[in-house]
Regions:
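Conserved small/polar residues in nucleotide/adenosyl-binding loops
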Residues: 248
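Oxyanion-binding "anion nests"
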Residues: 199-244
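Active-site bordering "gate/hinge" segments
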Residues: 2-213
């Protein structure tokens, strides 16, 4: 069992290691640091950025289970980092990401990720820390009498929608700034009921590769690697984005 998280999530990591070890698992773990990562990115040359992560590659090639938590001390830690540096670093992560996706797809690797409440994420959500804790734990239904039974109930309800959507071939989404058609004929809908992402409550599929046409506008900002973009609009033709716009 591989356990990974930012160092701010150490209490979660500690408890997971304890319970997994008691259950008989052989545990490996990795605690990351935003400060250390910043220095690594800032002072690496192109070859070093693309070198990859030997720890992740080695572990994910062999692990049976990967448990991870999201949460850091600073949601904007890499906002001012050059986008090209981040791009080259992502290229270096391709090998371990391939191990992850291939082994997840084959069933060799089981994964589950969850949110760990942090002060920075509470601030991002415009909540006090205690409010954010209640929000996260409430989303996981951890305070109901029988969380497992409740997630099984949600799974059954979502499965009803999965069976309904499996009979559909096209989805047409229309709203303010959005008019897009998605071909899902022959695609399999997946019931996400807490076994991978936790908490969950999602039903998803993928479109036919050349079967998306129209435009979509996002009313909320897109945030990636600490960079925030407002007013995103994508224009899609035959499954490819042919134009993108943003306000900031």
């Amino acid at each position: 069992v591989f356990v990974s998280a930012d160092e701010v999530c150490t209490p979660w990591v500690t408890e997971v290691i304890k319970e997994a070890t008691k259950a008989g698992a052989y545990v490996e773990y990795k605690l990351s640091s935003q400060e250390a990562r910043e220095m690594q990115l800032k002072y690496s040359n192109d070859e070093q950025l693309r070198h990859g992560d030997l720890i992740m590659e080695t572990i994910l090639e062999k692990a049976d289970v990967w448990l991870s938590a999201w949460g850091g001390r600073n949601t904007r830690a890499f906002t001012n980092m050059d986008a090209e540096i981040l791009k080259k670093s992502q290229e270096g992560a391709k090998k371990w990401r391939r191990f992850y996706s291939d082994r997840m797809g084959s069933g060799e690797l089981r994964w589950c990720g969850t949110q760990y409440p942090t002060q920075s994420d509470a601030q991002e959500a415009s909540m006090s820390f205690s409010e954010y804790e209640d929000f996260v734990y409430g989303a996981g239904l951890l305070e109901v009498d029988d969380p497992v039974a409740e997630w099984k109930r949600i799974s059954a309800e979502q499965e009803r929608w999965v069976k309904y959507l499996d009979t559909k071939s096209e989805i047409h989404i229309v709203s303010e700034g959005t008019d897009i058609k998605v071909n899902v004929k022959g695609r399999k809908w997946i019931n996400c009921d807490g076994k991978a992402n936790f908490p969950d409550g999602e039903i998803f599929t993928s479109p036919v590769e050349d079967g998306v046409n129209g435009y979509i506008t996002f009313s909320f900002p897109g945030i990636y690697a600490g960079k925030e973009v407002e007013g995103i609009k994508l224009i899609v033709k035959d499954g490819k984005v042919i134009e993108d716009r943003k306000s900031t």
